[in-house]
Amino acid sequence: NVAQAYAYEMYVGGFWCHQNPNNGESVNERLSKVGFPFTTVGENLAIASTVRSGHQSLMQSDSHRNTILDNEFRRVGIGVVSGPIGLIIVQVFS
């Protein structure tokens, strides 16, 4: 799962951003690398104490909510990793 792998990568690498600062990969490149077909892609990231609070936080942000509700997306992958600062949550939409 691309979302789970990226959540873990951020946890181990000690970063939290859409583009991996160590290798420059974007969500598009991560999907392409595993051969996942897509035309449109979106990614949401959150750090929260629970999955519910992370989702609520994303839904309160206009841009993140728009990604979640975008009817062009037909698939979603979700990754969650628990660390010392809480849960790292990654949502990948295509």
Positions of PLM-derived features:
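Functional surface patches built around histidine and acidic residues
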Residues: 1-94
